């Protein structure tokens, strides 16, 4: 079983809202997931506090046990929008 940290799309047409989830890679994008880690709202400006919220401790846990982040989640980490540094 390959576990991925990825975005699951929700919201209305032309008003996307994403959940950051941990899911089996074989499951559909918006299907069943193992754990909800947070959410991402691309309709808000980056400075808004609700633009991207993630449970950092759970993200670190899943990365430590071998879950693979998708391209977009990796981009968030590289840009510093999600911090994986020790507090």
UniProtKB/Swiss-Prot annotation:
Assigned keywords, A-Z: Ribonucleoprotein, Ribosomal protein
GO-annotated molecular function: structural constituent of ribosome
Pfam families referenced in this protein's UniProt entry, alphabetically: Ribosomal_S16 (PF00886)
PANTHER family: 30S RIBOSOMAL PROTEIN S16, SMALL RIBOSOMAL SUBUNIT PROTEIN BS16M
Protein family according to the UniProt entry: Belongs to the bacterial ribosomal protein bS16 family.
HAMAP family found in the cross-reference section: Ribosomal_bS16
Protein name as catalogued: Small ribosomal subunit protein bS16
Organism: Ehrlichia ruminantium (strain Gardel)
């Amino acid at each position: 079983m390959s576990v991925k940290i990825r975005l699951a799309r929700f919201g209305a047409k032309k008003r996307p809202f994403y959940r950051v989830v941990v899911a089996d890679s074989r499951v559909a994008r918006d299907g069943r997931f193992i754990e909800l880690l947070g959410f991402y709202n691309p309709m808000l400006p980056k400075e808004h506090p609700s633009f991207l919220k993630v449970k950092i401790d759970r993200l670190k846990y899943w990365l430590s046990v071998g879950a693979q982040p998708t391209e977009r989640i990796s981009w968030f980490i590289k840009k510093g929008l999600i911090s994986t540094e020790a507090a």
